[in-house]
């Protein structure tokens, strides 16, 4: 249900968010 949707959304966002986090570290 909801957790499955959140999981798929997180998988789509992770590739975009990871480089931003990497730049800040």
Swiss-Prot record:
Gene Ontology biological-process entries: defense response to bacterium
Lineage of origin: Eukaryota, Metazoa, Chordata, Craniata, Vertebrata
InterPro entries named in the record: Caerin_1 (IPR010000)
Entry's Gene Ontology cellular component terms: extracellular region
Function: Caerin-1.19 shows significant activity against Gram-positive organisms, but is less effective against Gram-negative organisms.
Tissues showing expression: Expressed by the skin dorsal glands.
Entry keyword set: Amidation, Amphibian defense peptide, Antibiotic, Antimicrobial, Secreted
One Pfam family from the record: Caerin_1
Family per similarity comment: Belongs to the frog skin active peptide (FSAP) family. Caerin subfamily.
Main location: secreted
Location of this chain's protein in the cell: Secreted
UniProt KW Secreted keyword: yes
Protein name: Caerin-1.19
Sites of Leucine amide modification: 25
């Amino acid at each position: 249900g909801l957790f499955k949707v959140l999981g798929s959304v997180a998988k789509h966002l992770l590739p975009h968010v990871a480089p931003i986090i990497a730049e800040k570290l």
